[in-house]
Amino acid sequence: NAVIVLTRALQQDKKNLELQKDLVMSYYLKRDYTKALEGVKSLLDRDDADVICFQLGGNVYKALEEAKECEKVYKKGLKKFPKSGPLFSEYGELLWATKDYSAINLWEKGIQLDPGYSGNYYNAAVYYFYTKDKVWSLVYGEIFVNMESLSQRGLAMKQQLLKAYKEK
């Protein structure tokens, strides 16, 4: 069991960031959100917390349906890593899930600051598919497909693009 191995490894090296992240992820994947939350809190308090720590924190709070705490984690993460495409993407997804359509501002900011991260293009394209402005859905969708053509999301986006082109 990964949790046992990681716990033993952390007994040998208590300050190892990678082991702590792996342990939190193991708890998260096992759906043991209480233990994952304990681990995330200690990760986020570390001075050397990286982007992945904040992503893990957001995912754990999302799983616990604590949107306000989740939002705090993303804001704290973006304060520390203001050019993190993944944090902009996931924060936008949180807002979108709560029907806050200002999420598009986060995705477009993520595209601007971290153009190599595909998730923001995907989310922005999906957002614009639901609006009257189909041009941006096509632009962002095409860029996304060029970045991530073989994934499931890439295949779904290709279908969405085809549908949008047929509407024009």
Name what the model sees in each region.
Residues D22-M25, G39, Q55-L56, E90, ...:
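Canonical tetratricopeptide repeat
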Residues F129-R153, Q159-K166:
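TPR/TPR-like (Sel1-like) alpha-helical repeat modules
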Residues K14, D48, P82, P115, ...:
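Short coil turns that delineate tetratricopeptide repeat
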Residues L19, C53, L87, N120, ...:
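TPR alpha-solenoid repeat register
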Residues L29-K30, K62-L64, W96-T98, Y130-T131, ...:
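Register position in tetratricopeptide repeats
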Residues Y33, A67, D100-Y101, K134:
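TPR-repeat structural position
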